[in-house]
């Protein structure tokens, strides 16, 4: 008996601890770090061949004898799952723009200006070091911010980071990634499929029309959203942008407003009380079942579709998509002399561009926006926050790796670029995290004048 009670107590403690862990903001960041370490170990072990072979295997869906669709596992992760990641980030960003921290033009323009500076300065640093060499083709490499890793580090810091700063980073990183996607489309893509691109924009237009005409059923949005993603996948433009476009179209106004909900709920509760006074069995009384179902339906219809979709995806995003993404992309082989890598113009351009250029550009353009009066930051944010988030934005990683593969054919240049990206991203993550941990006084007034 006593042993049984102790066992139940132990199980209860373990369950409670696990629940608290999964509820913590840091859990997603911890999963991300573990996944990154696993990927690096696999890529530098005897299983490296099997690891890369697995990612290159095709996952095919056959709908009929003449209709099938397949991508490699790596493509499903980077082009498919990451589109969902961008959807979640886009939903959060839209919510903040509509009713949150970015609801004013000045507050919304601050991260956009920061993103512009965070792209321009790293590119200029790289160009200045590589002008006149074949390495110049890699000028777009240090421009990118890896939104998944950046948000993962912010999540790892938990409540030491103000919520407003996370919102700022999301807006900055999405703008940065859209900029990187445009750079890829304009300067690194061999050709665009205008038919698919036009079809994708048509799907986007249809989604906007659905929103405008008051369609609230998420099923229809998801169906058209999948078509939107497929069109961009085949257009020559990175399909993750489809996630952002899809998020823009999701309605934020609920099907049932609060006034009508209040009236209906009051009526339903009154009717329910009448059935209870008659002492009817709820399992046998169909009237009670109908009333309870009506209350449930009305409550569900009072929730904005945007929040429904965001809440349904947030845990899947944090505990599955981001770790899987890390396992698939962090596997860089460390088989070169690190000193030689970062001392050459290519490696140095990437290293300085990401680790120094990002924070410099973000800081300068934020200051310009403040001085010109075109942007403003939340009162809880100060210069240390901007420097810290600017450094974390220097985590280029996957988008930088993607541009590397487009910019160079020489395997030696690709290897140097990848190692430099990894080192720069690591320095940026550590530097930014340390600064933000030292600046965890959320209540300080804004000193960005």
Curated annotation (Swiss-Prot):
Family membership: Belongs to the NhaA Na(+)/H(+) (TC 2.A.33) antiporter family.
GO biological process, alphabetically ordered: regulation of pH
Record key words, sorted: Antiport, Cell inner membrane, Cell membrane, Ion transport, Membrane, Sodium, Sodium transport, Transmembrane, Transmembrane helix, Transport
Parts of the chain that traverse the membrane: 30-50, 69-89, 112-132, 138-158, 168-188, 192-212, 218-238, 241-261, 312-332, 348-368, 386-406, 419-439
Gene Ontology cellular component list: plasma membrane
Subcellular location: Cell inner membrane
Membrane topology type: Multi-pass membrane protein
Its job: Na(+)/H(+) antiporter that extrudes sodium in exchange for external protons.
Catalytic activity reported: Na(+)(in) + 2 H(+)(out) = Na(+)(out) + 2 H(+)(in)
Pfam families linked to this entry: Na_H_antiport_1
GO MF annotations in UniProt: sodium:proton antiporter activity
Chain segments annotated as coiled-coil in the UniProt record: none
The protein's name in its UniProt record: Na(+)/H(+) antiporter NhaA
InterPro entries named among the record's database cross-references: Na/H_antiporter_dom_sf, NhaA
């Amino acid at each position: 008996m006593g042993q049984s009670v102790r066992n139940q107590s132990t199980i209860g403690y373990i369950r409670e601890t696990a629940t608290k862990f999964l509820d913590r903001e840091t859990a997603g960041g911890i999963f991300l770090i573990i996944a990154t370490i696993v990927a690096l170990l696999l890529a530098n072990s005897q299983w490296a061949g099997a690891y890369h072979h697995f990612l290159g295997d095709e996952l095919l869906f056959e709908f009929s004898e003449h209709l099938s669709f397949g991508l490699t596992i790596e493509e499903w992760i980077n082009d498919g799952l990451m589109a969902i990641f961008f959807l979640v980030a886009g939903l959060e960003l839209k919510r903040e723009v509509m009713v949150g921290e970015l609801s004013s033009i000045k507050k919304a323009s601050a991260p956009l200006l920061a993103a512009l500076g965070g792209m321009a300065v790293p590119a200029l640093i790289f160009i200045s070091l590589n002008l006149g060499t074949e390495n110049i083709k890699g000028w777009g490499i240090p421009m990118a911010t890896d939104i998944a890793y950046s948000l993962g580090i912010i999540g790892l810091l938990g409540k030491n980071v103000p919520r407003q700063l996370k919102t700022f980073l999301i807006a900055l990183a999405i703008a940065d990634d859209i900029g990187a996607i445009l750079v890829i489309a304009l300067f690194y893509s061999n050709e665009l499929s205008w038919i698919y691109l036009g079809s994708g924009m048509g799907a986007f237009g249809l989604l906007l029309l659905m929103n405008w005409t008051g369609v609230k059923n998420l099923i229809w949005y998801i169906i058209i959203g999948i078509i939107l993603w497929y069109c961009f996948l085949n257009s020559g433009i990175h399909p993750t942008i489809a996630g952002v476009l899809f998020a823009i179209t999701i309605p934020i106004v609920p099907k049932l407003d609060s006034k009508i909900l209040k009236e209906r709920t009051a009526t339903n509760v009154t009717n329910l009380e009448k059935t209870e006074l008659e002492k009817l069995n709820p399992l046998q009384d169909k009237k009670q079942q109908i009333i309870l179902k009506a209350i449930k339906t009305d409550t569900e219809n009072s929730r904005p579709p945007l929040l429904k979709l965001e809440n349904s995806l947030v845990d899947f995003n944090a505990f599955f998509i981001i770790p899987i993404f890390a396992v698939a992309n962090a596997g860089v082989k460390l088989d070169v002399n690190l000193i030689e890598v970062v001392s050459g113009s290519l490696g140095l351009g990437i290293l300085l561009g990401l680790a120094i250029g990002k924070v410099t550009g973000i800081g300068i353009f934020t200051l310009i926006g403040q001085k010109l009066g075109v942007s403003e930051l939340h009162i809880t944010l100060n210069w240390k926050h901007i420097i810290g988030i600017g450094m974390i934005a220097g985590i280029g990683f996957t988008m930088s790796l993607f541009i590397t593969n487009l910019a160079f054919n020489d395997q030696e240049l690709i290897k140097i670029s990848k190692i430099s990206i990894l080192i720069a991203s690591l320095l940026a993550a550590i530097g930014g995290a340390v600064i933000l941990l030292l600046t965890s006084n959320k209540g300080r007034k804004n000193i960005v004048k």
